Amino acid sequence: SYGYBZKSAGVSVPGPMGPSGPRGLPGPPGAPGPZGFZGPPGZPGZPGSSGPM
């Protein structure tokens, strides 16, 4: 071993999209994605879509 544990090389996935915002405002960012196998937290999800004008 060279001090590298494959299990620690987590693969992050995007979180879910945030809810749509009211009155045409952008929704908030989605929640962070789940962590990989002992890897870093996932990237934040995409912002929610715009609500109705």
Curated annotation (Swiss-Prot):
Type I collagen is a member of group I collagen (fibrillar forming collagen). Trimers of one alpha 2(I) and two alpha 1(I) chains. Interacts with MRC2. Interacts with TRAM2. Interacts with MFAP4 in a Ca (2+)-dependent manner. InterPro entries: Collagen (IPR008160). The modification 4-hydroxyproline is found at P26, P29, P32, P41, P44, P47. It is found in: Secreted, Extracellular space, Extracellular matrix. The keyword Protein biosynthesis does not apply. The modification Phosphoserine is found at S8. It comes from Oryctolagus cuniculus (Rabbit). This is Collagen alpha-1(I) chain. Its main location: secreted. The modification Allysine is found at K7. Keywords: Collagen, Extracellular matrix, Hydroxylation, Phosphoprotein, Repeat, Secreted. Residues 10-23, 34-53 have a biased composition (Low complexity).
